[in-house]
Amino acid sequence: HYIFISSVQKYHFPPPTRVIVSDYNEGDSLRSLIRLLQEVEGTRVTLIGDVMLDRYHHGYSNNLNSTAPVPVLRVTNSEESPGAAAHIARGLFSMGLNVDFYSSVGDDDEGDLIIETLSSEGIQTDGIIRVEDRKTLTKIRFYGSRENLLDQSQVLLQADRGPLEDLDPRISEALTDSALGSLSSSQALVISDYDKGVISEQGSDMLISSAKKLGIPCIVDPKLTGLSRSSGADIVIFGIRGLELQKKRLMTDSLDEAASLLIETYSWGALLVLCLLYTSPSPRDHQP
């Protein structure tokens, strides 16, 4: 594991069970985030974003279809779980955080399943709006391998089911207003943006600005094609592939350079890429 900063200093530390970082000197919001991580139990977080249902089918494939060069999957087991922002809600709640969650689902079985699953785990779902005559986004993935190579399973196909029309802006506005109302009693704001309509340009700007005024940290998991909706966030989260794609788009020579440019362009406090943390130059004390 490494921490990288934009001045290209590098710190190596062993995989920790808990990491404590102090003297960040990145402003009140990041110091609040550090305290939040140190004292998680009972902390309240406002989470807003798009949700979907993840459905997985696993099996083996020993032969091709007789009429087309595609594998025939013999399904051996299936599973499904709430994804996107709903997955984040479950993760935060499992850490001991109280989550005020705001999102929308369709008026269908998939939407019911998301709400029922979250409710059964103790997560509040009052902030989830059911949209009449709308389908819940569902991502269906088929995994398979040869029967004697089950430990080498790979994705054979992904099928998406969901609405063709945009989310009514009034739904987004209502969710944003509700999230804004909960910020005064929260210790952090988390935005999970999959560009499915819950997070708008105006809404994200209002949320991030309000969080800054209240001195609470704002963490954004952004859509790579909608980074403007994360402008001003304290922490932005990428997968490593996301940073690699941005490096190509920005035509930089290194991931470090791409990270520094993104931080400057969108006024982020830091960019977290899996085990990489990019920030603006400043002294820091890292204590494993």
Residue locations for each model-derived region?
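Conserved beta-alpha-beta core of the PfkB/ribokinase-like small-molecule kinase fold
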Residues: 61-72, 142-162, 167-257, 277
